[in-house]
Regions:
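Non-catalytic, solvent-exposed segments at the cell envelope interface
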Residues: 2-359
């Protein structure tokens, strides 16, 4: 466990994620251990991850069109709760935390909870990009508040830097910078490229049009239509009529439609897209660091791999202080995360992913 630079006098119990282990695993109402998470299925791709990936595209276009000045830049803050020597780092591996939020608050003192936390590791050693998603319901210690809570609460208590501090403290990896994107950016981007063509089913149109409060007074009609940004966002958020798997399929449909539209867009449209969407992105990287990060990522983009925290067989559902959470074996997750980011080659990960796909 990293050594805190500020003393914490609160007594630690088996509920504290810094000390929880298999021997402290909770039991269900029948006195039996709950099922451990297998994690064999891919983590669901939420709308906020969708927006985060779009933010990367905007930064890429922004570097080429000179509109990065419209991005909000914050001063970089070092973690005061853990010393750098206790964090795993390598100058040849760049770690940037991407945060997806429902809306960025105008009052910087009170950030909203982060819906998505994805660590992008550009590994110049093994020439690959490694993406690690952190589930928001993981029960962790939040150092800025000196308390344990769900991981996504770290943003509310400590802002974007608070999320970085919390992940570093609990999982022992150095995070160099963060990038934040919100849902408003998605709408602006779609409108900037003139909308996206999507085929809407009768059930989807009925769900959105019939629930104005849920979808912001948006109207959809069945059939193939060119959707505005607001309509496309409502379409991506549909979830009541089917499963999460179908919802993520809708999101991929829109994502592909956006990429297709961008490929056929002229330079002026791409400039307009980047210029309009850039104000909805926030980071603690300078312009030069942003462009450097994009350049390094481009050199490694031929190989990409994904992981999720918690890793398979390292977690279980629990109820703590009335909260339904994901309890984890923290030391095992820390070990596997460091191994994934810094040690594993692309060939090793290809074999692991192929084996997992067969199970």
């Amino acid at each position: 466990t990293p050594t805190p630079t500020r003393a914490h006098h609160r007594e630690r119990t088996s509920r504290d994620p810094r000390t929880v282990s298999r021997s402290h695993a909770p039991t269900d109402k029948h006195g039996k251990p709950p099922k451990k998470g297998k994690g064999s299925k891919k983590a669901k791709v939420g709308l906020s991850i969708f927006c985060v990936l779009l933010a990367l595209i905007i930064i890429l276009v922004g570097c080429a069109t000179g509109v990065l000045g419209k991005i909000t830049y914050n001063a970089h803050k070092e973690n005061e709760y853990v010393t750098a020597s206790n964090l795993k780092s390598d100058p040849r591996v760049k770690n940037v935390l991407l945060l997806g939020v429902d809306a960025r608050p105008k009052d910087k003192a009170s950030a909203s909870r982060s819906d998505t936390m994805m660590l992008i590791s550009v590994d110049s050693v093994h020439h690959t990009i490694k993406m690690t998603s952190f589930l928001r319901d993981i029960w962790v210690y939040i150092p800025c508040k000196d308390m344990s809570q769900r991981l996504n609460a770290a943003c509310q208590y400590g802002g974007y830097s608070g999320v970085v501090d919390t992940i570093e403290y609990n999982f022992g990896v150095k995070i160099d910078n963060y990038v934040v994107a919100d849902f408003e950016m998605f709408q602006v981007l779609v409108d900037a490229i003139g909308g996206v063509e999507v085929k809407v089913t009768k059930a989807e149109a009925k769900e959105v049009t019939g629930h104005p409060k849920r979808y912001g007074n948006v109207k959809l009609e069945a059939g193939k239509h060119n959707l505005t940004g607001k309509q496309a966002l409502a379409y991506c958020r549909i979830r009541k009529i089917d499963t999460d798997f179908v919802r993520t399929k809708r999101q991929r449909t829109v994502m592909n439609a956006i990429i297709k539209k961008m490929k056929s867009s002229n330079p002026f449209t791409l400039y307009k897209m980047a210029s309009n969407a850039a104000p909805y992105i926030e980071t603690d990287m300078t312009k030069s660091k942003l462009c450097s990060f994009v350049a390094k990522a481009g050199n490694c983009a031929t190989s990409t791999h994904q992981a999720r925290v918690p890793f398979p067989d390292t977690w279980w559902y629990d109820t703590i202080n009335g909260n339904s959470v994901i309890a984890i074996n923290k030391e095992e997750n820390k070990k596997q995360l460091i191994d994934f980011i810094y040690n594993k080659t692309s060939e090793q990960l290809d074999k692991e992913e192929a084996a997992a796909a067969k199970n």
